From Swiss-Prot:
Keywords: Actin-binding, Cell junction, Cell membrane, Cell projection, Coiled coil, Cytoplasm, Cytoskeleton, Developmental protein, Differentiation, Membrane, Neurogenesis, Nucleus, Phosphoprotein, Synapse
Tissues in which the UniProt entry reports expression: Ubiquitous. Abundantly expressed in the brain. Expressed at highest levels in hippocampus and at lower levels in the cortex, cerebellum and brainstem. Localizes to the dendritic spines of neurons. Also localizes to aspiny neurons, such as GABAergic interneurons.
Protein name: Neurabin-2
Gene Ontology MF: a single term: protein-containing complex binding
Region (Disordered): 1-93, 117-166, 216-445
Gene: Ppp1r9b
Pfam families: PDZ (PF00595), PDZ_5 (PF17817)
Region named Actin-binding: 1-154, 164-282
Region (Interaction with D(2) dopamine receptor): 100-371
UniProt remark on domains: The PP1 binding region is natively unstructured, upon PP1 binding, it acquires structure, blocks a substrate-binding site, and restricts PP1 phosphatase specificity to a subset of substrates.
Amino acid sequence: MMKTEPRGPGGPLRSASPHRSAYEAGIQALKPPDAPGPDEAPKAAHHKKYGSNVHRIKSMFLQMGTTTGPPGEAGGASGMAEAPRASDRGVRLSLPRASSLNENVDHSALLKLGTSVSERVSRFDSKPAPSAQPAPPPHPPSRLQETRKLFERSVPAASGGDKEAVARRLLRQERASLQDRKLDVVVRFNGSTEALDKLDADAVSPTVSQLSAVFEKADSRTGLHRAPGPPRAAGAPQVNSKLVTKRSRVFQPPPPPPAPSGDAATEKDRGPGGQQPPQHRVAPARPPPKPREVRKIKPVEVEESGESEAESAPGEVIQAEVTVHAALENGSTTATTASPAPEEPKAEAVPEEEASSSVATLERGVDNGRAPDMAPEEVDESKKEDFSEADLVDVSAYSGLGEDSGGSALEEDDEEDEEDGEPPYEPESGCVEIPGLSEEEDPAPSRKIHFSTAPIQVFSTYSNEDYDRRNEDVDPMAASAEYELEKRVERLELFPVELEKDSEGLGISIIGMGAGADMGLEKLGIFVKTVTEGGAAHRDGRIQVNDLLVEVDGTSLVGVTQSFAASVLRNTKGRVRFMIGRERPGEQSEVAQLIQQTLEQERWQREMMEQRYAQYGEDDEETGEYATDEDEELSPTFPGGEMAIEVFELAENEDALSPVEMEPEKLVHKFKELQIKHAVTEAEIQQLKRKLQSLEQEKGRWRVEKAQLEQSVEENKERMEKLEGYWGEAQSLCQAVDEHLRETQAQYQALERKYSKAKRLIKDYQQKEIEFLKKETAQRRVLEESELARKEEMDKLLDKISELEGNLQTLRNSNST
């Protein structure tokens, strides 16, 4: 279970992750830093303390048992402007293991990290110091130094015998100057055990970036800032700064002067009293190299040993700087200075007295540990061999007494940089331009697309030897969960909602969505799965399905487990304040699709279950078989349908408290978690008791129903026997009716034949009648025509008769006359 803290007005929304720390380190490196002056007061704290895991890690590594030199053997450095006693004391660095509760730690990788860092610091610490400083007496080597020796022996020789001799001389100097010290890098790994490798020759390696990111994150959590000025007075408040910033400048050094040969050059370069100035390093004249990069990593936490803490002043600060000017890979070196040069008075924001004192602090240890038979020429030769492939690195270390508290002034530095108007950071160019595309001979005039012929920039990346990208021990899904959550919350529309919790709860059920859900990581967040109809959320109407729960009563639910979110919702009372995140209109996220698919799958499973129960019920009705008591006890029951329960199963494999973890903050946090678990468990027990009581009542009711059903079965058997007798009588009656039906069908067929015959006769008669009428009409017409002809003939004859009678009369008259 991940620890959640209430989100303040300016606090982060989630805890640190290695990916985001590296990202912030890269962003910080691109900003122009501005070191505050020595008289500036520390910035105000953000009122945020370390988590309990930091104290647990620190206590665990304090018990590893390392030997440090007695406080009396650390001699004071005369002529030093700052930290005269603290610079000689033994310093302790403790490499903590991972801060999460359920992660394994590769201690060998952490020891290798501390060894590589101490080797880099001591490797460049090879300047001669004033001869007046006596060499410290030898001390028994610590465990970290023994581990480093074994690691150095295992590394194969990269060059011939001269290179090995120079390396052995440098190792002797390193052991003599750092026997009573242990370099300690306090790193807070969030489950990431990425391999950190050596510095690259042309650019800062991922090791420097990740260390810077770690310390910047630690400082941003504590909220204090220490100015790299002079140490405070004895009565000043005790502050232990852990701020690490990278300050980079790209500059062109002036051409080196011609170096004289022999002892004359050595004597000329030495200051009064035969001491070589700590800020200058002379090398043979070479052509001016390309612009090189200056990187600062400061301040690294350095804690004093237990014996030195008792006698040191409260406000003493250990301050050290290592300045290494590396030339190109071809072995050329130039004379450079750690103090501000006349040509670049503001190249580094470090006071002159601070640079001189800090450089002299480390030079004294190297001079004390150098073999007496080594000549200055050999030292210069070893410097040439050693610095030919290194970067220009400035390392400052600050330490103060007191509790683990520090601060971050990243935002203040950014504002100061903008006010001062310094030029932005320009990283060293790591790209090569190659010829681009050739111009086309005959491009089509109608074509609207044209290809650029500008040179193509090819950027070089780290090789696998310089940057080990393998990360088998960390789940990438879990490591980027919080980063994904923050990016998702930024894209959502956030709005507050206040609900009044009633006796039935809030009326919502939640679901944790994410690929890492099996490990307790809800990568996509806590979402509203269902809204109970008639509940508080349903009556309010503002909370909908698929909404993201960002906060509940000030408790952030980003990057927490589903069980923790359920316990937070269960323990709310009265008026509950929500911070809801919702997709903007027109957007359909993958989370909404996942929740919709989940609800559809559950609905499908519920329908399949109901169909299965219905099928079982039909089979029971047909066969008359019923489930036994054992089947009833084992079968699932859903008396009230699907219930939206906000209580979820808690993880049982929590880490047990060990003596190392017995700190008040850890115990208080664990006690609160146990209280929440206890309340959740009691609620689950009460709910299970109510379920058990309802199931027992349901079981008794089912038994009564079973007896009633058995009695009804007996009655139904008697009724079935009576129905069988009725069925036999009905069969005989059906046979008689069937015979009568057959007779009726025969009669019907005979009548049908007679009817068809009569129908044919009627048709014949009607046809004959029609023909008779036609004949009668024709004969009547012929008769009428004959009558008309006779009538006309009769009229003609009558006319002739009358005419003849006239003629006859005429003749008679004539005859008479």
